[in-house]
From Swiss-Prot:
Keywords: ATP-binding, Chaperone, Coiled coil, Nucleotide-binding, Proteasome
Subunit structure: Homohexamer. Assembles into a hexameric ring structure that caps the 20S proteasome core. Strongly interacts with the prokaryotic ubiquitin-like protein Pup through a hydrophobic interface; the interacting region of ARC lies in its N-terminal coiled-coil domain. There is one Pup binding site per ARC hexamer ring. Upon ATP-binding, the C-terminus of ARC interacts with the alpha-rings of the proteasome core, possibly by binding to the intersubunit pockets.
The protein's name in its UniProt record: Proteasome-associated ATPase
A GO biological process held by the record: proteasomal protein catabolic process
Homology family: Belongs to the AAA ATPase family.
Binding-site positions, ATP: G289, C290, G291, K292, T293, L294
Amino acid sequence: MSGPRSGSGSDGSTGRPGDAESRRSAYEKETHELTTQVAFLEEEVAMLRRKLSESPRQLRVLEERLAEIQAELSAVTGQNDRLVATLREARDQIVTLKEEVDRLAQPPSGYGIFVSSYEDGTVDVFTQGRKLRVTVSPSVNISDLLPGQEVMLNEALNVVETRAFERQGEIVLLKEVLEGGDRALVLGHTDEERVVMLAQPLLDGPIRSGDSLLIESRSGYAFERIPKSEVEELVLEEVPDIGYEQIGGLKSQIESIRDSVELPFLYKELYREHQLKPPKGVLLYGPPGCGKTLIAKAVANSLAKKVEAKTGGQGTGRAFFLNIKGPELLNKFVGETERQIRLVFQRAREKASEGMPVIVFFDEMDSIFRTRGSGVSSDVENTIVPQLLSEIDGVEQLENVIVIGASNREDMIDPAILRPGRLDVKIKVERPDAEAARDIFAKYVVPELPLYPDDLAEFGGNREATVQAMIQRVVERMYAESEENRFLEVTYANGDKEVLYFKDFNSGAMIENIVARAKKMAVKEHIEGGQKGLRMQYLLAACMDEFKENEDLPNTTNPDDWARISGKKGERIVYIRTLVTGTKGTEAGRSIDTIANTGQYL
């Protein structure tokens, strides 16, 4: 301590108390300042230590806050995207609705029928009952427009689009195509004549007189050829597949109709050399079920085959068989039946003009061509009969058409139809006698059928002999004038009486039915475990069943009319009494009152 003070003295200091005090005061002040600074630094260090210790927690809070803010930002961004999408969708809907409103607010478009075009780019169209000259949109090629084609028109009636041809309208009958080929004379529903224009489809395809055409009456255009459905319902053009060999018991009738129908077609030159006119018509008459329709079908088939053979297979070698369903010709509307008859003969003329033989067959001819004035509640025959007469007389100019009629009441057909020059040839198809019945049975009972072993053994296994014996036995049973075969007792107007047997009412249809019954018996017997094959016993039983089934069929209200239909002619019948006994012969015959009921026709 003494050193410094010595030093101080040596430096020239006097060592006075005032100086020391000031120095001490300066030291104390400096010390206080340093102490204050140290304290401040210590507090700063402590604060920094606290902050350092608290920094991780704050960092985590900040990180969490940052994450929350990012999540909120993402949510806001997604919401903003959805809002943008919603706005875009709303804008699209507004645009679509505006287009729909604009579309619905557009004026309606019209339709017209194209008629013709001109060099200046205008065209004539028919629309709303008026013929107009209009312009064409640049999007439509005028050269593609066809006469009769439908076109679309805008509000200004300009062509803006092409359409197809009209598919609906009125059906008319083509009478003839007029000069120039683009017009036609047609007949309407009431036979009213009018001239129409032919649309392009009809100009491109062949049409003939008698064709049915579809027209649009307002524009006067015909668009389409319609198949003749109304005629197709009444006729069968294809030749039936029935030959003479399938018909039994009618040899003389077949020969007569072949001479009348086939010879004039096959030997035209000979007929011309002999100045012989071929018959224009044939009437087949007789009781029901005796083969009139079969003969007509067979002659058409035979004629077709012979024409083909004569031409050596050249050409089609066809014949046409127009089978007219008589009652279906009748129509409640005035003039319709006559129109149908004209259509039928028009079809016949078309086919005949092609060089092919045509047979027009009227079945049940008495139902539509009755004697004029005989109608009870109508006089429709007064116009139908003259229509047929005019058509038959018109056939005179044709070489390949013949009319065949079939009826079981020829007395009801108008005499003008039956006179020579119309239905020239009249062939009676009678009920089969015993020989004819054997021939008919032979068509259905043939050696190829399964035969009962016992019956076959009786004839030494000879199938031909067995079948012949079966047929002979059942025919003898049918045609025997025995007590059990008695059917009717008829009383004539003069008081005479006559007993009629079942054989007097036999027919080919009845024989076919008897054989069918017997075959069914054989089938049932085999199904139930019995032996297989047709036997004589079944044929005899079927014959009795057929007789028994028909005992109530005679018409007793008007016996004379019934007799005429059944083929009995002569003295007028006033009373009918059945004589049928039971299957065991124990039931008594019974009389049927003439006022009982209307009955049926046998």
